[in-house]
């Protein structure tokens, strides 16, 4: 099991509740950046550490370079958020985008949150789990 998986999983309900609160305040149709900043504020008020950008090292065939990742939100260094504000959903594309960030940053769990979906808690949120992050390892 990924070292941060349980911590990230424990945060998901709180993050979804905060997202619902933000969506109720602004309704559907606000800019994605507004939703993200307000979600970040809700989580900071609840005592969580947040960030929205990180420089990471990429290694490829003997070449090493730094890349600036502009993910939407990272909470307590373990849960990644990909926020959207669209009526038409492209959930597969959004999940792949989030999964790419999760792999590059070695984060076990992420949430795609579509503030444009009026049924946010049930149909507007998708969990994305890094392969193997939620599995127990058995040693013999």
Where would I find each of the regions flagged by the language model?
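A short, glycine/Asx- and small/polar-enriched loop/turn
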Residues: 64-69
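Solvent-exposed, charged helical/coil patches
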Residues: 1-49, 126-134, 138-140
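Short Asp/Glu-rich motifs
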Residues: 42, 62-63, 121
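Short secondary-structure capping/turn micro-motifs that flank functional sites
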Residues: 39, 59-60, 118
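Amphipathic alpha-helical interface surfaces
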Residues: 35, 39, 76, 94-97
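Conserved catalytic cores of phosphodiester-cleaving nucleases, focusing on short active-site segments
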Residues: 27, 71-87, 101
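A short acidic/basic microdomain associated with nuclease active sites
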Residues: 44-61
